[in-house]
Amino acid sequence: MQAEQMRQEIYQALVDAKGQDIKVLDVRKVTDFTDYMIIASGTSSRHVQTLADKICVRMKELGLMPIGREGEAVGDWVLIDFGDVVAHLMRPQVRDLYNLEKLWGDGERVEATAK
């Protein structure tokens, strides 16, 4: 699956699961370990875990399994690595603290739309 299609499927899964403040960054010019980063907030640790589950279920339906899935024990910040796309799912307070959008600010913002 192409990175752009993977990005769209993950974005749609987040929209369907009511992810908040979803941002998509094209980081191909900034790093070589991934093409896109998707950052989204959940209202609680449980919601963050639900967002992660929804992404993994959707991608499994498409025949893709994550390379890695980290942070579920606490649920404040869950990272799911699909190689070409990395999803960061966080509670708003954690997102404010780490401010990944600023850290990866050299990446280009991608305007994604839900189906």
Residue ranges and their predicted role:
Residues M1-F33, S45-V78, M90-V94, L100-K115:
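Polybasic/polar functional segments that serve as interface/processing modules
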Residues D35-M37:
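Catalytic metal-binding acidic patch
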Residues I39-S41:
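Short hydrophobic/aromatic beta-strand micro-patches
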Residues I80-F82:
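Active-site beta-strand termini and strand-to-loop segments that position acidic
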